[in-house]
Amino acid sequence: MSDKIDNQIVKVENTNNGGLRAIFNLDGVTLDTPIMGTWDKPVFFGKEIAEFLGFKKPKDALQKHVKPKYKTTLSKVLEKKLDTEPVSYNEGKRVLLYKEGVVELIKKTRLVGIENKIDALIEAFELNLNVVHQTKEQEHIGAILKVFTHERTVTQYKVKNYKIDLYFLDYKVAVECDEFGHRDRNGESEREYNIIRELGCTFYRFNPDSKNFCIYQIIGDLVRLLYKDH
């Protein structure tokens, strides 16, 4: 099977040993990974899928975000096959995901700009997402990025043990989307203090869940903040 999705190629091929390989070529980012099971009921290698979706710590993501009933191990899958060679203990512990497990990872990813990857997975394997997979953070940070394409920005900018939703490098402005109001206010204050001390930056926060939220107002505020000295 091969499909064109927004000029991106998604292929699923049979291998010589009767297995499957999923091959994605998306804007120069390629995933070529083996799949267990059958075409109707594929089982995915979790680490590869998590990395593909932008998780920096795939093992942690698999443990934290995927319910036990939606994942298994390579050794358990191979137990059901009579014609396979045994694998090492460590190899057998590799985490595999059912379709539902892949869906859970998609719902949890917060990386901006990976919509093509998500669409490719959904289309190729007919994944059922009953909720909108794009978070408010992804939606609104993505809108800001489209306005400021001429500026040097980094999403999920790492500062020691912290990450900033969006950072304007040349202006030292940190933009934070306080989705759900960032409930732990004391923890957020400490986090902000430590980041400011490290970078000497200015923080700009917005809450997409506030009653009068307007993304155009946020963009206007950022224009005034970034270019106040011009």
Swiss-Prot record:
Bro-N domain ranges (all copies): 20-139
Pfam family, one: Bro-N
InterPro entries for the chain: BRO_N_domain
Protein name stated in the entry: Putative Bro-N domain-containing protein 069L
Organism: Invertebrate iridescent virus 6 (IIV-6)
Lineage: Viruses, Varidnaviria, Bamfordvirae, Nucleocytoviricota, Megaviricetes
